[in-house]
Amino acid sequence: MFRVGNGIDFHKLIHEPFRPLVLAGVEIKSEFAFLGHSDADVILHAVADAILGALSLGDIGVHFPDTDPQYKNMKSTRIIEKCLELVAEKKFKLINVDCTYVGDHPKISPIRAELNASLANITKLPLDCVSIKATTSEGMGALGRSEGVMVMATVLIESLKK
């Protein structure tokens, strides 16, 4: 049996030269950062929600509430680690991850290979089983004004139960 999960996440872009801008576990050189309770890794948050959705286990707000101080500035790689533990506990296996990044900053094309490699490493998947694509909102709305970014993620999991 296969299951599909979808996740979506938004983060506001702020001028904060001393806060790291993190995407797919990679710190990107920038004078900007994403506003968030954790490290605000918008890619990993969308992937986590997709995994939790495929497992019918809610979302990251249920498992890692932003009202809990223990999660302040937490690395989002830890969120993915916990999600992968849940995948194993429920006797499933992660098959692939597909992400679409919507935003103007930072540009994904120059760092795509590094982001894909990091996402593959974090999710313990082969490189050809992860994908990060990018587009813009063509200048429309908050995303078009570079006020923030959005990531949509889709995952496929397979049951290991016979």
Swiss-Prot record:
* UniProt name for this protein: 2-C-methyl-D-erythritol 2,4-cyclodiphosphate synthase
Cross-referenced Pfam families: YgbB (PF02542)
- Tell me the organism: Leptospira biflexa serovar Patoc (strain Patoc 1 / ATCC 23582 / Paris)
Q: Which CDD domains match?
A: MECDP_synthase
Quaternary arrangement and interactors, per the entry?
Homotrimer.
Report the EC number(s), separated by commas if there are several: 4.6.1.12
Cofactor annotation remark: Binds 1 divalent metal cation per subunit.
Q: Which residues bind a divalent metal cation?
A: 9, 11, 45
Encoding gene (name): ispF
Q: Where is this site: Transition state stabilizer?
A: 37, 136
User: Which keywords describe this protein according to UniProt?
Assistant: Isoprene biosynthesis, Lyase, Metal-binding
The lineage is: Bacteria, Pseudomonadati, Spirochaetota, Spirochaetia, Leptospirales
Q: Which GO-annotated molecular functions does the record name?
A: 2-C-methyl-D-erythritol 2,4-cyclodiphosphate synthase activity; metal ion binding
Cofactor(s) recorded for this entry are:
a divalent metal cation
